[in-house]
UniProtKB/Swiss-Prot annotation:
The gene is GSTM1. Keywords: Cytoplasm, Lipid metabolism, Transferase. Conjugation of reduced glutathione to a wide number of exogenous and endogenous hydrophobic electrophiles. Involved in the formation of glutathione conjugates of both prostaglandin A2 (PGA2) and prostaglandin J2 (PGJ2). Participates in the formation of novel hepoxilin regioisomers. It is found in: Cytoplasm. Homodimer. The keyword Lipid metabolism applies. Substrate binds at Y115. This is Glutathione S-transferase B.
Amino acid sequence: PMTLGYWNIRGLTHPIRLILEYTNSGYEEKRYNMGDAPDYDRSQWLNEKFKLGLDFPNLPYLIDGTHKLTQSNAILRYIARKHNLCGVTEEETIRMDILENQVMDIRMQLIMLCYSPDFEQKKAEFLEGIPDKMKLFSQFLGKLPWFAGNKLTYVDFLAYDVLDQYRMLEPKCLEAFPNLKDFISRFEGLEKISSYMKSSRFLPKPLFSKFAFWNNK
């Protein structure tokens, strides 16, 4: 089986865990634990970091036989290619490329907020900007069932994850966008996803590491 290595948090790895489950991939997880404040000891990971044969040692990593990958989107795309969860047409590919990067942008904006010591002060302004972000996602999805088109692709796993994170921060943020709410329901209704969400393997939170200022436990 494949081995997925990451901190014992949701973090950047939720879409990867979801796609591994959806595709029925045989995998095991190596979840590294971080120590508590003030040191946040990382030795569980650091002791192995340079022993795994990774080109750019980092978390998450995926080891699949001779293939050893880092970078969360590279891992996600690798699994997607094995299972035809990539677009076929140029139009689908363009939409996937745009959305993959757009998701990373709004993910990083949320990460910057949540790891900021000024989280409480910055939160109000951040919340004000959420409707505009969601509106663009809603317009991009339009009447399509999935973000690239009529079939599920790896970017739906990314979009689901980031929309869900924003929903955790601001529970009403999707209320004005019925197509995004329907997308979430459609995704969570996929048989493999639904059963994974009910299993003990499912790790919906903490979103972030112990030194974040929100959703850190």
